């Protein structure tokens, strides 16, 4: 029996007005580039991000598409381009988690080289970036993420495209998402997340937000 996950209501979060405003602004205009939230444990960082799931709207996606492509848009993955007709279905915008220990293949996806060599066709195994397309990509403790994976995320977020290349075979798909990262300043003392490409930063202490304590955004 499938059980529904209970989320703390976004509207019930007390304080942290700057944090909530930063998240909502990114939902309204994803072109902002995401938000990096820094705060001690117990300051509702993860709670606020996960609470967004209940207030996100529904969008139209191509039925069966591994990347959630927009049936009304021009940016389509190779799978959609091969279809004779695109059927659309509605689903809610997703909040997709990226675990800190993820491998590169898990993040960007992988190509089945055996199928490519044997049958002469590309077979793509979607990764986290495909799941997060047109949604929110959430990285808890982003300061602990491998530097190479940080570069992968920032490149995909900036370009809006994820490209997987293996042995001369490539697959590109739309990768448009709001990148939300959280970090604990105590754990970040020895390893800071680099400041690159626009976005917002927010520092939270207790129930009050401190703009002076905000780190550089992603």
Language-model regions: role of each:
Residues 1-209, 216:
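Conserved ASCE/P-loop NTPase catalytic core
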């Amino acid at each position: 029996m499938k059980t529904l996950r209970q989320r703390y209501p976004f509207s019930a979060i007390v304080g942290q007005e700057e944090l909530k405003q930063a998240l909502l602004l990114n939902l309204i205009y994803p072109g902002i580039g995401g938000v990096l939230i820094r705060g001690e444990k117990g300051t509702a960082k993860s709670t606020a991000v996960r609470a967004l799931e209940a207030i996100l709207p529904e969008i139209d996606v191509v039925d069966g598409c591994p990347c959630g492509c927009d049936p009304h848009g021009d940016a389509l993955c190779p799978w959609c381009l091969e279809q004779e007709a695109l059927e659309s279905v509605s689903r809610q915008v997703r909040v997709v988690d990226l675990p800190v220990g993820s491998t590169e293949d898990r993040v960007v996806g992988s190509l089945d080289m055996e199928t490519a060599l044997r049958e002469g066709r590309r077979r793509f195994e979607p990764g986290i970036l495909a799941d997060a397309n047109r949604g929110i990509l959430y990285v808890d403790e982003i300061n602990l993420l491998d530097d190479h994976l940080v570069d992968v995320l920032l490149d995909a977020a900036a370009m809006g495209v994820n490209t997987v290349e293996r042995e001369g075979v490539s697959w590109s798909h739309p990768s448009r998402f709001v990148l939300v990262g959280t970090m604990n300043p105590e754990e970040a003392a020895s390893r800071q997340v680099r400041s690159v490409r626009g976005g917002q930063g927010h520092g939270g202490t207790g129930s009050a937000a401190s703009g002076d304590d905000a780190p550089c955004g992603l």
